Regions:
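N-terminal glycine-rich phosphate/adenylate-binding segment common to multiple enzyme folds
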Residues: 51-157, 170-171, 266-270
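N-terminal beta-loop-helix "entrance" segment that forms/cooperates
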Residues: 34-60
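Phosphate-binding loop/pocket of nucleotide- and phosphate-handling active sites
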Residues: 365-386
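Glycine-rich phosphate/diphosphate-binding loop of Rossmann-like nucleotide-binding domains
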Residues: 7-24, 33, 149, 153-242
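Buried hydrophobic positions in well-ordered alpha/beta secondary-structure cores of metabolic enzymes
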Residues: 12-15, 71, 127, 188, ...
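Flexible, glycine/charged-enriched surface loops at secondary-structure junctions
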Residues: 35-41, 195-204, 228-241, 333-341, ...
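Glycine-rich phosphate-binding loop
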Residues: 64-81, 223, 227-296, 380
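Glycine-rich phosphate/nucleotide-binding loop
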Residues: 49-52, 250-352
Length: 386
């Protein structure tokens, strides 16, 4: 029997509901697809509020060791206290394991009500750089000695005179490297070719930030031409670019013009969430953080902890379920992945979903988290025939 160990973080808030839902669905799909030939052994590891209460650490060393050892894992949403000097746990996981690609597939499922007239035209795969840009977390608060020292360096050593209110300014640094750009664009181009997607679009603000965002555009084109010149010449791949604000408009007007998107960290955050809204919202938006060189990957719910609805059995578990679909595909277990997607789409088509989705569906039937989970498991076990 092929059995793999998958470390998982239940997560904070609604994580206690969506993560067990995902596991039940995945277990059913693996059992239906492979019988006793394959299986998953789930290994719980801690992070977030529960980890802090039980161990005194928000991100214990044992958790990082598990993800390092087993390489592929999955996590629910995590809390990071705002303004208390505690680094984002999601960012810490990505940077510690150097998970330089944040992948966000965006597609429409039949039955989901979309604000677009033709949501079926949306079929994109976002490759968001995950370790650099503003999200590198290099910043200093206004009024601190560090902020003053940084300003003095800018002013005295670098001749910068454009800071309008230096005494009350906080400062942040936006690192963008050639190496970081190249490995992201390389992964995007390889994905496009392997999945027969026609183009890679570099989304940037190089018109304003000429050396960071502009460097991303320049280095991205150079990498594509150097390593994928044959495919470009043969027409098997098109590399193009778009200013970020124009891209956000174009995705609403001509979404069919785009397939694989490569972009920096901050733009990628905005782009991913807008695209998710176009096909039903972040509640059904999956995500993954991957290092293609080492094979390490953490799949995750893309929404927050939603403490206001935690414990009420109403949260939509589809984000982490679809992230598990991505995980199964990454492992090469495509039969199980397809079973889950088909079961979800069939349920949506019949207007049976959690309340956040069902309320927009004509004749929609609102199901609790647990009832929706049972619904999907039943459809999987019955081969999606009923």
């Amino acid at each position: 029997m092929e059995k793999i160990t998958v470390p998982f973080i239940t997560g904070d808030g609604v994580g206690a509901e969506v993560t067990p839902s995902m596991q039940a669905v995945v277990n059913a799909a693996v059992k239906k697809s492979y019988g006793d030939r394959r299986g998953i052994e789930w290994k719980e590891v801690l992070a977030g509020e529960r980890a802090f209460h039980e161990t005194g650490s928000w991100l214990p060393d044992e958790t990082m060791e598990a993800f390092c050892t087993y390489k592929v894992g999955i996590k629910g949403p995590l809390t990071t206290p705002v303004g208390r000097g505690i680094r984002s746990l999601n960012v810490a996981l990505r940077q510690t394991l150097d998970l330089y690609v944040c992948q966000r597939p965006v597609r429409w499922y039949k039955g989901i009500v979309s604000p677009l007239k033709e949501p079926q035209k949306v079929d994109m795969y976002v490759f968001r750089e995950n370790t650099e840009d503003i999200y590198a977390g290099i910043e200093w608060e206004a009024g601190t000695p560090e902020a003053e020292k940084f300003y003095r360096f800018l002013h005295d050593d670098m001749g910068v005179t454009k800071v309008r209110f230096p005494e009350t300014s906080s400062f942040g640094v936006k690192p963008v490297s050639r190496e970081g750009t190249e490995r992201l664009v390389r992964a995007a181009c390889q994905y496009a070719l392997e999945h027969h997607m026609p183009s890679v679009t570099l989304v940037h603000k190089g018109n304003i930030m000429k050396f960071t965002e502009g460097g991303f555009k320049k280095w991205g084109y150079e990498l594509a031409e150097r390593e994928f010149g044959k495919e470009l010449a043969e027409g098997r791949l098109v590399i193009k670019d778009c200013i970020a604000d124009a891209f956000l408009q174009n995705t609403l007007l001509i979404p069919e013009e785009y397939s694989v998107i490569a972009t920096l960290n901050l733009n990628g955050d905005y782009v991913s969430d807008q695209l998710a809204a176009m096909v039903g919202g972040i509640g059904i938006a999956p995500g993954a953080n991957i290092n293609y060189k080492t094979g390490h990957a953490i799949f995750e719910a893309t929404h927050g902890t939603a403490p206001n609805i935690a414990g009420k059995d109403i949260v939509n578990p589809c984000s982490i379920i679809l992230s598990a679909v991505m995980m199964l595909e990454y492992l090469g277990w495509k039969e199980a992945a397809s079973l889950i997607e088909n079961a979800l789409e069939q349920s949506f088509t019949e207007a049976r979903a959690t309340a956040d989705l069902a309320r927009f569906m004509p004749g929609g039937v609102s199901l609790s988290t647990s009832a929706f989970t049972r619904e999907i498991v039943r459809r999987i076990e019955n081969g999606n025939n009923e």
